[in-house]
Amino acid sequence: MDIYYFFSVWTPPVVWKSFGEGEVASGGSGSFNSEHSQVYAEFLTGFAKALEDKFGINVYGISGWNEPDQAMGGWDGCMWGNQQMADFTMDYLRPELNKQGLQDTKIIYGELPWWANAVTWVETSLKNNPNLADANIVAAGHGYSTVDANILPMTAAQEKGIHVWQTETCDDKTRDETWNDAMKWAKNYHDYLTKAQTNAVVWWAGARQCTSTGENLLQTDAWDFSNSYYRIDRYYSIGQFSRYIPVSYTHLRA
């Protein structure tokens, strides 16, 4: 079975961030300080290189941001500007990956929390920076709080032959383990594959203990070290896609 490893760094180290007046310096606040672009590119590349050299893990893709238009403080995060991300990708991260022999490692680009915003973000980046298409990127966004009408194609990326991924989704607000919920997610996956024409859809959390949210596919009996688990119905409906659509299959529109 082919396994594609990709990693997202939620925030750079605090010392490589800038903070507004009165803003508490933390992992969950602040913006990236572009003065540290080269050292951050080396930091990310070194991580990917270490996994390859020490464990034989080929990193398929790496992202230096997570939901870059939000730094909400509930978890680690960091604000990025659109042009700032494009400049870092083209001028620092891509050259550093290439320099260290990781030309095939893709840069997961975008990753905004709401899909429609990610579509706009990628479109703006490619319009203002045509050479970004040559940086071996994957255009990406998350699927939180996204209504069906906002599951749109990233046309600007697709026209340039850039693969499009929906890199994170779950129900982060309610808990439902029923088959009705499973069918809701089956439709959601189907819409991303057909309406948005994505090349991949990624669920947020595989196995964990949840009490008030629908973040998981396997419910464990403890948060950290568990002794048992059970499968939630959406495990089966989502699993149909990964089971019956092998890598390299092509979607043909009728």
Language-model features and meaning:
Residues 1-123:
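Substrate-binding cleft and catalytic face of glycoside hydrolase catalytic domains
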Residues 4-8, 60-64, 106-109, 138-140, ...:
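Structural recognition of the beta-strand scaffold that forms the well-ordered cores
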Residues 49, 76-188:
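Noncatalytic carbohydrate-binding groove/subsite architecture in carbohydrate-active enzymes
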Residues 55-56, 129-133, 194-195:
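Alpha-helix termination/capping residues and helix-transition junctions
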Residues 67, 144, 206:
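Flexible loop residues that form catalytic
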Residues 166-239:
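Aromatic/acidic polysaccharide-binding cleft in carbohydrate-active enzymes
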Residues 243-249:
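Glycine-rich active-site loop/lid that clamps phosphate-bearing ligands
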Residues 250-254:
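Conserved small/polar residues in nucleotide/adenosyl-binding loops
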